Amino acid sequence: MRVLGIESSCDETGVAIYDTEQGLLGQALYSQVEMHARYGGVVPELASRDHVQRVLPLIREVMTEANTQPQQLDGVAFTAGPGLAGALLVGAGVARSLAFGWNLPAVAVHHMEGHLLAPLLEPNAPAFPFVALLVSGGHTLLLDAKALGEYEILGESVDDAAGEAFDKAAKMMGLGYPGGPRVATLAQQGTAGRFRFPRPMTDRPGLDMSFSGLKTFTLNTINDLGGKEALSEQDRADIARAFEEAAVDTLVIKCRRAVEQTGHKRLVMAGGVSANQSLRAKLAEQMKKRGVDVYYPAPQYCTDNGAMIAFAGALRLQAGERAELPIKIRPRWPLTELAKLQGAD
């Protein structure tokens, strides 16, 4: 089965073609980061307009790269949510129009299921069941992934997502947008032990998380040093290191509890923050002690991309799922509302 996938939930336009026998045949991605950076964050209206301009040229590019004609496709997959409503409508509208014109089935894909399944694109793919940590700018979830489409939430952030906290901490330090990668890079130059930030909600049972307190602690630390303008480069590096260490420790502690609670010996981490090298190293170290194998997507599949949507769509189309004819999106869409796919175990 060969599927065209379209991702447009936020500020990346991603297109890919995935074949269940040959793997990924082609992909293209356009990031709007530079456009949104001047505003310090994503502007939904600008994101939607840019998707309109980019998506069809990217589809043509990928079809050429994959040496694929419309008649060789078996379906079209698109991100239906969660995400920005206008951005989702662009991808959904184009996908449904192409599917109708090419007489192909279409399938709606949950954005976070796409992330969750991205590590399965790798040669050494994990089998169900496993614990999954989905950690990005919009979501931070710990899941018991029992089968394709059967997910139980073990814990989640009760306030800000981890990636959002990284971005806001970066903004407080004057590092610009997007802040997560900049904080991680700067943290490598930080002095260990100069500052120690709290590890929120790790002193109580349960798997829920909180990251808003880290933002407050960051702001208070900056103010204690005389404000953002008074910070030296070493101050910024030391704050970045303390912030990253606290966020990483919090996530690792919760993952450790999750594998102990479920008894699973496989852990998947996906989403934009899964590219953080400190988080990967600390998680691998802790899971190795417990005999748990850890799986990540390749770096290019950590952030939003079309490959994960094409892949997830292919699995759902194989199981007989089809999108209804009216174009429907779900800007808010709990992952637990996905139906388990019959025969997908």
UniProtKB/Swiss-Prot annotation:
Its cofactor is Fe(2+). GO terms for biological process: tRNA threonylcarbamoyladenosine modification. GO terms for cellular component: cytoplasm. It is found in: Cytoplasm. It catalyses: L-threonylcarbamoyladenylate + adenosine(37) in tRNA = N(6)-L-threonylcarbamoyladenosine(37) in tRNA + AMP + H(+). It holds the Pfam family TsaD. Its main location: cytoplasm. Binds 1 Fe(2+) ion per subunit. Fe cation binds at residues 111, 115, 304. Substrate binds at residues 134-138, 167, 180, 276. The keyword Repeat does not apply. Keywords: Acyltransferase, Cytoplasm, Iron, Metal-binding, Transferase, tRNA processing. Belongs to the KAE1 / TsaD family. This is tRNA N6-adenosine threonylcarbamoyltransferase.
